Amino acid sequence: MDRRTSLYLYAWRNHIDVDYFPMQTAEAFSVPIGGTCAIALDPTKIRSEADEAVKLSHELGHCVYGGFYNKYTPFDVRAQHENKANAWAVYRLIPWGKLKQAVKNGITEVWELAEYFDVTEDFMRWAIAYYTERKNYKFE
């Protein structure tokens, strides 16, 4: 089963609706609804299968840990919610052990790693920084 299919299956198994429709500015978003969650993706703003997987897994991250921010409260930190959603997506799409093994096998350029894991280059950069700077993991 390919990565995108497994993400959609994960959403289905967890009663998370995923819908597609054009949006003015957003590329994707998720909202809590009745004890579960719904995700919207703008199909006109999906640039590749890798981009779709990154966007979907990020929004699933919001749904899984319940990280939704409220612009009307001063106590809500948007960056914190975004980082948690990205971290969930990283663990799902680029597990540390597999990333470390890929590097050990000689796949060292960001574009090569992004291609290997079928994610965007920007997301791969975020994942590498997350593992090496925040988690202090080493490639040795």
Task: Label every PLM stretch briefly.
Residues M1-E140:
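Active-site hotspot residues in diverse enzymes, especially metal/ion-binding acidic/histidine motifs
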